[in-house]
């Protein structure tokens, strides 16, 4: 018999908000009696955008901007119905993207 598992993947641009959200999820799951592994930090995705500083010429003068996407992974093993219910009611910040797989 395979174990039931909920896999939660969090993404955010700000790592502080991401870590706070992960701690809320872990605390809520542990309070309801489920076994939690994580938060596991996944590799940070770094996207670099290069643009010209000038409008028409001066191609050698460029500026670079980067956007970092931080990720965390949380596994909840053998969740109870109370665990699922409490996770559904959990209020998280708006800057965090949550992906849940059952």
Swiss-Prot record:
Keyword Ribonucleoprotein: yes
One record GO biological process: translation
GO cellular component: ribonucleoprotein complex; ribosome
Highest taxon of source: Bacteria
Keywords: Ribonucleoprotein, Ribosomal protein
Gene3D superfamilies the UniProt entry points to: Ribosomal protein S10 domain
Any one GO molecular-function label of the UniProt entry: structural constituent of ribosome
Xref: Pfam families: Ribosomal_S10 (PF00338)
Function noted in UniProt: Involved in the binding of tRNA to the ribosomes.
Assembly mode: Part of the 30S ribosomal subunit.
Similarity field: Belongs to the universal ribosomal protein uS10 family.
Protein name, as recorded: Small ribosomal subunit protein uS10
Organism for this UniProt entry: Geobacillus sp. (strain WCH70)
């Amino acid at each position: 018999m395979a174990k039931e598992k909920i896999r939660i993947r969090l993404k955010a641009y700000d790592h502080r908000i991401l870590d706070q959200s992960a701690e809320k999820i872990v605390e809520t799951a542990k309070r309801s009696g489920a076994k939690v592994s994580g938060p596991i930090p996944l590799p940070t995705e770094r996207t670099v955008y290069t643009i010209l500083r000038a409008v028409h010429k001066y191609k050698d003068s460029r500026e670079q901007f980067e956007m970092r996407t931080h990720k965390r992974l949380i596994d909840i093993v053998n969740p109870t119905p109370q665990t699922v219910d409490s996770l559904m009611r959990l209020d998280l910040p708006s800057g965090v993207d949550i992906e849940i797989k059952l």
